[in-house]
């Protein structure tokens, strides 16, 4: 059990060292402040570079309900202080962490965790 450690990189490193349970507020706290976790890495949705970006937040997200929101729409929600932006990013982050943990379990079962770790340790 590892408490208070919550970045995807920290989780990957801890799993590699044998930790199998985590508890951290990072996914929800980050969502409320405009930071999204995605399979392509972290996205600070408040950044002006997303004002005209009509692509989904995470192209690899399996949850189609979350993937329908564009970066420019989420950027608008955060920059106008709409609570919906925080809610969507919080749900996105929780979903991402569920997908991450599912992929970790699957790769452990298949014996491919080290490859998975190496692919994502510097990306997430």
Model region roles, listed by residue range:
Residues 58-124:
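C-terminal extensions of enzymes
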Residues 1-57:
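Glycine-rich phosphate/ribose-binding loops and adjacent secondary-structure elements
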């Amino acid at each position: 059990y590892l408490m208070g450690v919550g970045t995807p990189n920290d989780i990957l490193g801890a799993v590699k060292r044998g930790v199998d349970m985590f508890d951290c507020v990072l996914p929800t706290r980050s969502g409320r402040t405009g930071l999204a976790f995605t399979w392509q890495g972290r996205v600070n949705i408040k950044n002006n570079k997303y004002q005209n970006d009509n692509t989904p937040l995470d192209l690899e997200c399996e949850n189609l309900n979350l993937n329908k929101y564009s970066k420019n729409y989420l950027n608008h929600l955060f920059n106008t202080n709409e609570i919906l932006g925080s809610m969507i990013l919080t749900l996105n982050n929780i979903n991402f962490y569920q997908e991450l943990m599912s992929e970790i379990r699957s790769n452990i079962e298949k014996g491919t965790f080290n490859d998975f770790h190496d692919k994502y340790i510097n990306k997430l």
